[in-house]
Design a protein with these regions (language model features):
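Short active-site neighborhood of thiol/selenol oxidoreductases, capturing the structured segment around
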Residues: 52-75
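A short beta-strand-turn-helix
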Residues: 39-59
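Thiol/selenol-based redox catalytic cores and closely related redox-interacting motifs
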Residues: 120-184
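Bacterial N-terminal signal peptides
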Residues: 8-19
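Structural microenvironment flanking redox-active thiols in thiol-disulfide oxidoreductases
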Residues: 74-130
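N-proximal helix/coil linker or "cap" segments that precede and/or mark the start of modular domains
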Residues: 18-37
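A short, polar/charged loop-to-alpha-helix boundary motif
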Residues: 183-198
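Bacterial N-terminal signal peptides that target proteins for export
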Residues: 1-9
Length: 200
């Protein structure tokens, strides 16, 4: 009981103080842009290449901050609920996170996710998509002391991805883009399915 109470207090402290950061989404890739190719490892250490996935069909890319974020977990669960519909459209769903594989695997298992979760080490891919922001010093200190963010991500840069979801056509064109600096707002999973249906 004490551990549960402690966890609740920690999360409340983080999400009350760590509200909206100065996240600039103006540089993020948008609808109509071409995606940047990448190769990242999944939670099992296997390499996954975007171009290879696009040869099979459309791809849904979704970024989340980490398994420690309740809003991220909720968004991932909602996508999991729509996974059958996503696959029915011939699409592949891929989640990207700066967390190290051990932590991304925990998130995948905790939420019973049946889609790929890739480690975007040092936010390199997120950066190329214009989705990286830096925590302010006060928030970074709280995240580190309460969540040990550097241990989760393998870096002390205090950078996180802006939560975003893209529907990418087979030619690499972004047909739907949802990028919101407010981490409490995420793309609706059912909307993602509807956007995929438009590609046919």
């Amino acid at each position: 009981m004490k551990n549960v109470l402690k966890s609740v207090i920690v999360l409340l402290a983080i999400f009350v103080v760590g509200t909206l950061q100065a996240q600039d989404a103006s540089k993020a890739l948008k609808q109509g842009d071409k995606v940047k190719d990448f190769t990242l490892k999944n939670a099992k250490g296997e390499e996954v290449n975007l171009s290879v996935l696009l040869k099979k069909g459309p791809v849904v890319l979704t970024w989340y901050r980490g398994g420690w974020c309740p809003y991220c977990n909720l968004a991932l669960k909602q996508l999991q609920e729509e996974l059958a519909q996503i696959k029915e459209q011939g699409a592949t769903l891929v989640a990207l996170t700066p967390e190290l594989p051990d932590h991304s695997l925990t998130t995948q298992e905790k939420n019973a996710l049946e889609f790929e979760v890739l480690t975007d080490l040092h936010n390199e891919v997120a950066r190329s998509y214009g989705l990286v922001f830096k925590l302010d010093p006060q928030t970074a200190e709280r995240y580190e002391s309460m969540l040990h963010l550097s241990a989760h991500n393998g870096t002390d840069s205090s950078e996180l991805p802006i939560p975003a979801t893209y529907v990418v056509d087979t030619d690499g064109t972004i047909r739907y883009a949802y990028v919101n600096p407010d981490y409490k707002q995420r793309a609706d999973a059912k909307t993602v399915v509807e956007e995929l249906k438009k590609l046919k």
